[in-house]
Amino acid sequence: MNDQNKNRNVLSRREFLKTIGAAGMAATGLTACAGGGNDGASAASAAEIPADRMTYRTNPTSGDKVSLLGFGMMRLPSVGGRSAREGNEEIDQEMVNELVDYAIAHGVNYFDTSPAYCRGKSERATGIALSRHPRDKYFIATKLSNFAPATWSREASVAMYRNSLKELQVDYIDYLLLHGVGMGSGMEEFESRYVKNGILDFLLEERRAGRIRNLGFSYHGDVRVFDHLLARHDEYKWNFVQIQLNYLDWKYAKRINPRNTDAEYLYGELRKRNIPAVIMEPLLGGRLSNVPGTIVARLKQREPEMSVASWAFRFAGSLPGVQTVLSGMTRMEHLQDNLRTYAPLKPLTEDDFRFLQETAAQMMRFDTIPCNDCKYCMPCPYGLDIPAILLHYNKCLNEGNVPESSQDANFRKARQAFLVGYDRSVPKLRQANRCIGCNQCSVHCPQRIDIPKELHRIDAYAERLKQGI
């Protein structure tokens, strides 16, 4: 494995810059085909949301013309106004319908869901919203999310797949993924979930029968599984692969977490095989839209009218071979901002790419915890709100409110911001001091965070702050 790491053919900086140039030409051409009209100079304008300027990419194996912006149905709105991933509130179906209608009216045609999303209710909500539109107006992507050992049998996995068809109200699935390969115990778990039970063979047969139009996988964790599946591409003929990619993970994913793999390598391997890439976590779980103030100022100085988040979406969308970039859009303003970015796309220039790489290097000086707020660690058997604790710490770190000493110039202000904000963000009975170290959370974390260790560290730090350090 060490030799393999040394020999990995990642893109050189020069190759990437050539790639960016090619992507710009391709994006411009596809946009012109999609809508015509002006050059898209007003894409960043808060006043305009073009309805006919979406950028599209064509899947080379199926010919599907897919919107560069994909709607991730993981963070659907709840009746209480929050994401339905949080708490026990019901999905706001009326708002989901409104978001889907608006997205389709503005050129979005790729909708990504899973049996695991929104406490098992995302597929049904997605099916209700999309079934109100002609079937040829959208592509549905869902996953075989057989994470629990109880679902590893052939019968249970087939039942999950059949239920997806029922919940989505369709007789075929446009894009079906093996969900989260590389997680857990890596190769051993992959074999148990998909190979030993014959499920991968079953899915290949479903593709031949036309009930699955495109078959792929989403990857987290053990890169040996990723490499294994690509090495057998001639046999499996993957139609697409979903990877985590953003301007921070491009070169720093492994430094952030040794379990992860730099997006530059993942993307490069797909490009070598001409496999379309579907991008998840373009904002790194929101971290790239909630950056430190110094980074906000840096981005705004370069492009005052563009949102902070749009930089991350432009980075992912500017790469050739990227079929669609997923965004979980809970509110209409999220959808509208992303539409301004991709309708049409203003591809990165070579200078933009260098600028973002320098920005990423600056961000790496902040020692944040790589939590993406995916909530796979929840629920905690002891009631902790794990993501809220980790995200509060990151927020304070980004804002300069994690003092190291009582002698720090802003100690009193930072101490108050951390402790008062902690109590406001996380109820006392759900804070880090309740962690007993059972470790039931860590095994579910796609980022492989040692969650008990981080919780104990944050709790110890909060106690030191209370004592005046």
Each language-model region and where it sits:
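Structural preference for beta-strand elements that scaffold enzyme active sites
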Residues: 66-70, 110, 137-141, 172-175, ...
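Beta/alpha (TIM)-barrel catalytic core signal, keyed to glycine-rich beta->alpha loops juxtaposed to Asp/Glu
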Residues: 181-391, 395-414, 443, 453
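Ferredoxin-like iron-sulfur electron-transfer modules
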Residues: 354-378, 412-437, 456-469
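CE4/NodB-like, metal-dependent polysaccharide N-deacetylase domain
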Residues: 156-176, 205-209
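Short, acidic/polar
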Residues: 89-103, 153-167, 223-230, 309-313
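N-terminal binding-site loop/beta-alpha segment at the start of enzyme catalytic domains
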Residues: 2-138, 202, 208
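Conserved, mostly hydrophobic/aromatic
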Residues: 59, 71, 111, 126, ...
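Structural motif corresponding to the early beta-alpha repeats
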Residues: 133-154, 179-182
